[in-house]
Amino acid sequence: KYDFDTYTSDITANFEAMEGREVRIAGRMMSRRDMGKANFIDVADGKGRIQCYVRVDDVGEDCFNAFKKWDIGDIIGLSGKVFSTRRGEISIHADSLELLAKSLLPLPEKYHGLKDTDTRYRQRYLDLIVNPEVKDTFIQRSQILREIRAYLDGKGYIEVDTPILVPLEIGASARPFV
């Protein structure tokens, strides 16, 4: 178990109050830019995404060497101070890193994304990781359904699930979709 204390969206929304403060976040490593003894990585949690600066002098050589073997898609935890880069991007200067879960399959390339419609529908989990607009659509759908259910529940209605496709005939000669 990794005890994080901040979501990435809290850092970006309240940067003035958070600047210089030590934070602990956990999320999926979405990209890495290697610059020798320093790396910039993007970490996405359930509420947003933030850039993190990882330097060998700050995390230690053993930790940094282990970090270099991690893959895009791995779930990591890190702690560090919030700062702004020279270009003005809100970031975390990491002082410790921890691998929380290994990604068994690689994520699609960042710039090409996941474009194949068949793959997007068959591997919905991947679509939700790679395409934030798809995730936003699912979140909105969930909120709408929650409000409709709350309204109807308040009026005394009950919810009944009715199956849409049910095999009524079972066996070798059954032809339910004719």
Label every model-predicted segment.
Residues K1-V178:
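Class II aminoacyl-tRNA synthetase catalytic cores and aaRS-like
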